């Protein structure tokens, strides 16, 4: 990547010409041109960045959300605490989420988005782009400290699903998860995320009987739709 290229060349220069190394920063500053680019909005700025950076790694939605969280927690004097929490959350998501597109963190934000949409009473089958959803009201959702807490709780729930945690789930619930894991699309993960966030108790646990009944219903619903109305768009409507 670009960073490694410059790092390796600077290291090589330092080892070969140690006495000249002190002049390198001045040399760079005297031969660099900084070109400021003004944009009307953050979306425009991001499009410009993506165009200029099309040979590098593009910014993910989660990168944008991280920046908003960072500003929020910095104002609260909790910058270091946030950095540690975010790093831990990223590592957790990389272990348990393997999306076809986007990043593991994007997947977590998508599952959480469905919960927030449900709380807001949004029943439209048209789902907004992830970034569009979270940027509403100047990223108000990401300026709520409780949002990060809920994201962590949701990620830990899916970690236990991934690990088939027998202390958290009964065998019959784990069997339902096994069947759903072979569903033709991932919509069931959004249903389950909404159910969990809405019905968990103070310890983050679910009533086994009610949860099992719910899983039975969505299993029948999803697999029936897969036969009669194949396609994820049909399932959304």
Predicted regions and their residues:
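Flexible coil/loop and intrinsically disordered segments
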Residues: 1-237
């Amino acid at each position: 990547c670009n960073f490694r290229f410059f790092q390796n060349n600077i290291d090589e220069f330092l080892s070969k010409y140690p006495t000249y190394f002190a002049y390198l920063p001045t040399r760079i500053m005297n031969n660099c041109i900084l070109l400021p680019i003004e944009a009307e909005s953050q979306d425009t700025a991001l499009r410009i960045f993506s165009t200029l950076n099309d040979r590098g790694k593009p910014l993910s939605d989660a990168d944008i959300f991280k920046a908003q969280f960072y500003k929020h927690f910095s104002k609260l004097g909790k910058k270091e605490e946030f950095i540690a929490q975010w790093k831990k959350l990223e590592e957790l998501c990389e272990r348990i989420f393997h999306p076809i597109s986007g990043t593991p963190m994007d997947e977590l934000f998508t599952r959480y988005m469905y919960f927030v949409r449900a709380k807001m009473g949004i029943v439209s089958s048209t789902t907004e782009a992830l970034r569009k959803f979270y940027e509403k009201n100047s990223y108000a959702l990401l300026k709520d400290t409780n949002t990060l807490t809920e994201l962590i709780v949701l990620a830990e729930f899916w970690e236990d699903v991934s690990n088939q945690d027998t202390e958290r789930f009964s065998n019959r619930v784990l069997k339902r998860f096994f069947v759903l894991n072979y569903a033709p699309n991932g919509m069931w993960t959004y249903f389950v995320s909404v159910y969990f966030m809405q019905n968990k108790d103070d310890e983050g646990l679910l009533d086994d009987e009610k949860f099992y009944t719910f899983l039975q219903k969505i299993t029948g619903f999803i697999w029936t739709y897969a036969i009669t109305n194949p396609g994820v768009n049909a399932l959304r409507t």
